[in-house]
């Protein structure tokens, strides 16, 4: 009887869920039933064990390769042509390459800025008079006669505003989409070229202009007089004088200020210049997938971040730190540099910053920006047939028309825009899909297989740690029957532990996904700081 009882208990023990052979023979994990088959160790079981371990090793290698690839945060670039019913016309800023009109410079102006403009030397005498035209030299001698002269207070902002080229005199003709436009449609703005003007700036309170068609005649067309007879005589190398004649133009978004001295293109007199544009919407990824800046701009001058706003803000701070003043075109309410500060500090400091200092002004690319691709073509104006007509129309000589008149025609090539977007090449879903596919290929496992392993570990934990407690509470069986009687209390405990195990598994999956999603971003952000 005792032997029969022992055999019965061994049989029951071998059928426990925590028994490894029971688990292996019931698991969906491929190869486990052959490795832990009942009976003695055989060569066949050894081969199955070797194959399983080899497959498991390959699985770990491939999974680690996928994980490493994910943490490289790769991205791809998507290019798309998007048709639109209408497009917002860009802001168009232009500046005369000559900053100051010679006829508007007074004796007091010349006294204060003569040396800055290389018109006078340090002794307030005309520099290089042999280089001047007779008419210019005569006018300059009258203004440079300082005997008994008492200088008045001088203001650089007023000087730039008063002597800069006036759009009411420069603008000869203007049309947008075939309708006439006027100087009032242009906003005055200051750049390093002095007094400039922006069409469709959005700063005058008027709604932004749109275009409904592509091609010439559906954009902005202006005829300008660059007024070369007002150009300052050039007798030396300064930042305030120019060797060229014409205008500098920048086509930009209304969300960014013009940076025309660095990003503008030139338009020469005597030509009609056609500028065919295409709007480009650029979308970049933030760290760790890309290098763009998604944070708002930390500036007291600009609310919207852009590369040009960042550079202007940086240049302003650089001059305030090194010269204790700002240039006229720079934002803010700080003290404007005097002519002496311009010559001795501001101009040299800004030139050094732009040309040589590559570490001070480091501006990240914004995550969302609009750019305009351009194609330029030119034709000669005036033609021989129109020269006399234009001379009569504007009451000028034919030579003046050739030397001073230009036409600028800006339009969209077509009513569509390019969308260039960076996208994540490998996301969490792809990582989990690859790992799941490799698990199925090498060991035939799935998420439910992992659940089986958790369930088995729960059974082992219950038998090893709680077995003694459960056996003490198990009711005694009579020797006359083989029925196993389980109390309701034991069933409740088992159910609670099983539910807790499943909840732990669910939490594990959730935490794994959260770690995959948020940990890379946190690591990337900390490394960026």
From Swiss-Prot:
It holds the Pfam family ASC. It catalyses: Na(+)(in) = Na(+)(out); K(+)(in) = K(+)(out); Li(+)(in) = Li(+)(out); Ca(2+)(in) = Ca(2+)(out). Inhibited by the diuretic drug amiloride. Glycans are attached at residues 86, 155, 161, 185, 368, 395. Disulfide bonds join 95-196, 174-181, 292-367, 310-363, 314-361, 323-345, 325-337. It is a multi-pass membrane protein. The keyword Protein biosynthesis does not apply. One of its GO terms (biological process) is cellular response to pH. Gene3D superfamilies: acid-sensing ion channel 1 domain, Acid-sensing ion channel domain, YojJ-like. The record marks 357 as: Involved in proton-dependent gating. The chain crosses the membrane at residues 52-68, 428-458. It is found in: Cell membrane; Postsynaptic cell membrane; Cell projection, Dendrite. One of its GO terms (cellular component) is dendrite. One of its GO terms (molecular function) is monoatomic cation channel activity. Belongs to the amiloride-sensitive sodium channel (TC 1.A.6) family. ASIC1 subfamily. Forms voltage-independent, pH-gated trimeric sodium channels that act as postsynaptic excitatory receptors in the nervous system, playing a crucial role in regulating synaptic plasticity, learning, and memory. Upon extracellular pH drop this channel elicits transient, fast activating, and completely desensitizing inward currents. Displays high selectivity for sodium ions but can also permit the permeation of other cations. The second transmembrane domain (TM2) is a discontinuous alpha-helix disrupted by the GAS motif, which forms the selectivity filter by adopting an extended, belt-like conformation aligned approximately parallel to the membrane plane. This peptide belt encircles the waist of the channel and divides TM2 into two discontinuous helical segments. The distal helical segment of TM2 interacts with the cytoplasmic portion of the first transmembrane domain (TM1) from a neighboring subunit, contributing to the structural and functional integrity of the channel. Homotrimer. Heterotrimer; with other ASIC proteins producing channel with different properties. Interacts with asic1a. This is Acid-sensing ion channel 1C. It comes from Danio rerio.
């Amino acid at each position: 009887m005792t032997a029969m009882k022992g055999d019965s208990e061994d049989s029951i023990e071998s059928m426990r869920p925590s028994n490894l052979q029971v688990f292996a023979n019931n698991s969906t994990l491929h190869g486990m039933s052959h490795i832990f088959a009942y009976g003695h160790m055989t060569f066949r079981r050894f081969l199955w064990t070797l194959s399983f371990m080899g497959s498991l090793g390959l699985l770990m290698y491939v999974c680690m390769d996928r994980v490493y690839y994910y943490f490289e945060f790769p991205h791809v670039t998507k290019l798309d042509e998007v048709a639109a019913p209408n497009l917002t016309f860009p802001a168009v800023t232009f500046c005369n390459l000559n900053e100051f009109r010679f006829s508007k410079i007074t004796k007091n102006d010349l006294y204060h800025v003569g040396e800055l403009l290389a018109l006078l030397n340090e002794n307030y005498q005309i520099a290089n008079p042999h280089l001047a035209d007779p008419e210019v030299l005569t006018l300059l001698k009258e203004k440079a006669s300082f005997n008994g002269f008492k200088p008045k207070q001088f203001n650089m902002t007023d000087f730039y505003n008063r002597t800069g080229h006036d759009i009411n005199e420069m603008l000869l003709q203007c049309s947008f989409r075939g309708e006439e436009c006027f100087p009032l449609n242009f906003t005055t703005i200051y750049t390093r070229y002095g007094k400039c003007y922006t069409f469709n700036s959005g700063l005058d309170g008027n709604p932004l202009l749109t275009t409904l068609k592509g091609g010439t005649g559906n954009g902005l067309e202006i005829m300008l007089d660059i007024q070369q007879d007002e150009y300052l005589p050039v007798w030396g190398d300064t930042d305030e004088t120019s060797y060229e004649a014409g205008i500098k133009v920048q086509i930009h978004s209304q969300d960014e200020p013009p940076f025309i001295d660095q990003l503008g293109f030139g338009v020469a007199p005597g030509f009609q210049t056609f500028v065919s544009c295409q709007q480009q919407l650029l979308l970049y990824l933030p760290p760790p997938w890309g290098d763009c800046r998604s944070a708002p701009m930390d500036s007291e001058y600009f609310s919207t971040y852009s590369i040009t706003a960042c550079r202007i803000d940086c240049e302003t701070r650089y001059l305030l730190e090194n010269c204790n003043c700002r240039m006229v075109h720079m934002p803010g309410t700080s003290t404007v540099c005097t002519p002496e500060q311009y010559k001795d500090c501001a101009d040299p400091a800004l030139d050094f910053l732009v040309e040589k200092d590559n570490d001070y002004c480091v501006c990240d690319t914004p995550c969302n920006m609009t750019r305009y691709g351009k194609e330029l073509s030119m034709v000669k104006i005036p033609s021989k047939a129109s020269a006399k007509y234009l001379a009569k129309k504007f009451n000028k000589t034919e030579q003046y028309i050739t030397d001073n008149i230009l036409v600028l025609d800006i339009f969209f090539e077509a009513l569509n825009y390019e969308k260039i977007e960076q996208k994540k090449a490998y996301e969490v879903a792809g990582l989990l899909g690859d790992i799941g596919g490799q698990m199925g290929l090498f060991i035939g496992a799935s998420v439910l297989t992992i659940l089986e392993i958790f369930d088995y570990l729960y059974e082992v934990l219950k038998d090893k740690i709680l077995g003694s407690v459960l056996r003490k509470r198990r009711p005694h069986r009579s020797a006359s029957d083989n029925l196993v009687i389980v109390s309701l209390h034991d069933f409740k405990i088992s159910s609670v532990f099983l539910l807790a195990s499943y909840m732990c598994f669910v939490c594990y999956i959730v935490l794994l996904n959260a770690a995959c999603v948020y940990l890379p971003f946190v690591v990337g952000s900390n490394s960026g700081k």
